[in-house]
Amino acid sequence: MSSTKIHLTKAAFTISAPDIRRLPADSGIEVAFAGRSNAGKSSALNTLTNQRGLARISKTPGRTQLINVFEVAENRRLIDLPGYGFAQVPLAMKKKWQKALGEYLEKRQCLKGLVVLMDIRHPLKDLDMDLIQWAADSDLPVLALLTKCDKLSQGKRSSEVLAVKKALSSLNADIQVQAFSSLKYTGKEQADAIICQWLEQEAQEYELPEEDDFDDSDEFTEEE
């Protein structure tokens, strides 16, 4: 069977879910986008899909509290996960959506690639590293997208990319690092190619877990 040809420009919003129980069936292939609340995740999604209003951009970091699903082809989805690391959010709310993030990462079998977005000026903070380490341990390919690279000179941008590559090389995992700018479209073509390659894999059938398999202990822990 030939693989599905993917065009990110065909992405269409389908649902916002508070947890994985309300997501589409765990089949096909998903690529998830995760990052700190001010990493420019929504802007990156809009740029990659050439749709200015696909992902809502909030001026208040920490507003994205749901798992947002965008379908790019039949059984091929982009997943916008809740942002993490923003302090000015009520603790109860923070725990609720960080639990949703952790459950998704641990339980979603159709997840085949993870895009971790980091401000190029402040990459690899503790939660970023935790997320990338988890992906490496799970044999999940990662695209480390260093956003807002238009804020740096070409020389500084290159040195930051090299520094991140060096820091992640010890994980011996499938991790690619790319400078990215939603404003200047820097890195758009390269990121598009990587994400589409993930989505164009052959999908496998999975045995869905029973409802009792989900427990409250599965949580992506937020630092205080």
UniProtKB/Swiss-Prot annotation:
CDD domains: YihA_EngB (cd01876). GO terms for biological process: division septum assembly. Its cofactor is Mg(2+). Residues 27-201 form the EngB-type G domain. InterPro entries: G_ENGB_dom, GTP-bd, GTP-bd_ribosome_bio_YsxC, P-loop_NTPase. It comes from the Bacteria. GO terms for cellular component: cytosol. SUPFAM superfamilies: P-loop containing nucleoside triphosphate hydrolases. GTP binds at residues 35-42, 62-66, 80-83, 147-150, 180-182. Keywords: Cell cycle, Cell division, GTP-binding, Magnesium, Metal-binding, Nucleotide-binding, Septation. Mg(2+) binds at S42, T64. One of its GO terms (molecular function) is metal ion binding. Residues 205-224 are annotated as: Disordered. Belongs to the TRAFAC class TrmE-Era-EngA-EngB-Septin-like GTPase superfamily. EngB GTPase family. Necessary for normal cell division and for the maintenance of normal septation. This is Probable GTP-binding protein EngB. The gene is engB.
